[in-house]
Amino acid sequence: VDFTFAPCLDLDYGQSAVIGNRAFHRNPRVVSILATAMVSGMAQAGMACCGKHFPGHGYATADSHVELPVDDRPLTDIRTNDEVPYASMGTLLTSVMPAHVTYPQVSPAPAGFSKKWLQEELRGRLGYNGLIFSDDLSMKGASEVGEITARSDAALAAGCDMILICNDPESAKTVLENQRWIRTKAFD
């Protein structure tokens, strides 16, 4: 399978150094148009994709690789801006990756560990039926959930179909040896 963790569907609010030039644009409709063209080209070449970082990492200023970012906006703001590319692209997205960002007005848990975000918003309201990959569980933005096995448990319980542990072989080994694996409906 030819696959990439792209496109980045985050909006460029001009305040997130970690997203920065990874974002296509500030306008969600422009992001949707450009990302659709990118994904269509990838599909023609036989490559699967992953839209990230649901519901949006562009507004939060902190870098989730080193700390847990917080986005204090209400759900209505996020829906009318950051979720637009996900809503417009729908089944074009082979998979989606949630953000290691907390949205306290919506859920106390970071999006990748939140049933509110993954089950109610992404799968429920937006009707998304593809795969959900966690973001890298070895990132500092995920560490507030607990140790590595607790993170993998929480991501899977929230609705992730697959978990990622990058550049940390010992943590990957710990999860492989201790995780209670379940089959999700995405594989049926």
Each predicted region: which residue ranges?
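Mid-sequence acidic-hydrophobic segments that form the walls
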Residues: 2, 12, 41, 45
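Surface-exposed, active-site-proximal loop segments in enzymatic domains
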Residues: 14-24, 63-69
